Amino acid sequence: MIRANETNDCGGFFMDIDREKEGKCLTVTVPCYNSESYLERCVESLLKERDGLEIILVDDGSTDRTGQLADQYARAYPDVVRVVHKKNGGHGSGVNAGLMLANGIYFKVVDSDDWLDEAAFHKLMSVLRFWCRTKEEKRPDLVVCNYVYDHLEEGKTKAVRYGNLFPSKKSAGGTKSAVFRRNSILSCMR
C-alpha cells in the first residue's frame, strides 16, 4: 500500500517504491472514488489475466468502503495488486498517480465502473505479451482495441470499432480502448 506524501515533488507520492515487480507487461490503473458497489466487478475482470499484469488501485479519497476493498485485493493478490490512498484530487490525479508508480511496459486506464470482457482481455494480453518479448525498439507505442459501451441504466449498447482509422501495416490492434507504452507517455511529461 502506498500513501500520499505532501513533502516531495512527484505529485505527493513516494517514489521509493518496491521495484521487484518490474518486468510486468501491462500496468492497469483503476482510479477509484466511492466505488464500493462496482469495484469488485472491475477488479475481478482484470484478475482473469494475472500473468504479466500489475493493477494499481488508486483510492482518491473515497468516503465509502472503496479503500478497504482495494486493500483486501492487495492482500489477496500481492504480486499483482497495489493500492494508493490519496486525498481527493479528481480522476486525472488518480490516473497520474498510477502512471507515476507503474512498472509495466504498457499502461492502461480502466475506470472503476468499467469491466473487461474475458475473451477480449485475453486476446489483448496475448498481443501485449508478444510485444513485451520483442526488442524495445520494435514495440509499438500504442495498441488500440475495439470496445463495447454498455449504458446499463438506459439499456443501450454501442460498439466502437477502430478498423479503418490506422494504416493496416502500422497498427497493432479514446483511452477506453488504448494501451500506451509507459515510457512514451513519461517522455511527454518531462
Label for each model-derived stretch:
Residues 2, 6-190:
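Nucleotide-sugar donor-binding/catalytic module of glycosyltransferases
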